[in-house]
C-alpha cells in the first residue's frame, strides 16, 4: 500500500478509525523530510495492513497548527484512534521498523486502562 496524502478535512477520519495509522508531517523544502520519505514509503509497502499518511505542512497549515507541529519531520502513530507516539526528527529505517513493531505489539486493553486511570486522577485533583 502506498502512502496517502491527507488534507486537514481528512485527518480526523484517518486517525480515529480502527487499526494503526502513521502520520508524517513534512514539507518539500525540508532535507530530513526528503531523507525519511523513502523509508516511510518502503514501510507502507512492507506493512499493507497499516495506513501510512503524509501531511504537507506548507499546504495544510491549519492541521499542522492544530497538531502543534513546530519541527518537521514529525511522526505520529495512532492505534484505534489513540495517539501512541509522537516525535520530531527523521528516524533511520531500523528505528522506524522497531517503532512499527512496538505499535503493533501494544496491548490496547492496557492502554485504555491507563487512559482511564489518568482521567480519574485528573478528576480527583
Identify the residue ranges that each predicted region occupies.
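Short acidic DE-rich linear segments
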Residues: 117-125
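Structural cue for short, hydrophobic secondary-structure segments
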Residues: 24-26, 77
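Conserved Rossmann-like nucleotide-binding pocket used by diverse enzymes
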Residues: 2, 26, 51-53
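Non-catalytic, surface beta->alpha helical segment in thiol-disulfide oxidoreductase systems
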Residues: 71, 77-110
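The canonical Cys-X-X-Cys-His
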Residues: 30-33, 75
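A short beta-strand-turn-helix
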Residues: 3-21, 61
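Conserved helix-turn-beta segment immediately C-terminal to the redox Cys motif
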Residues: 18-22, 35-55, 61
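Short pre-active-site segment immediately N-terminal to redox-active cysteine/selenocysteine motifs
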Residues: 19, 26-29, 71
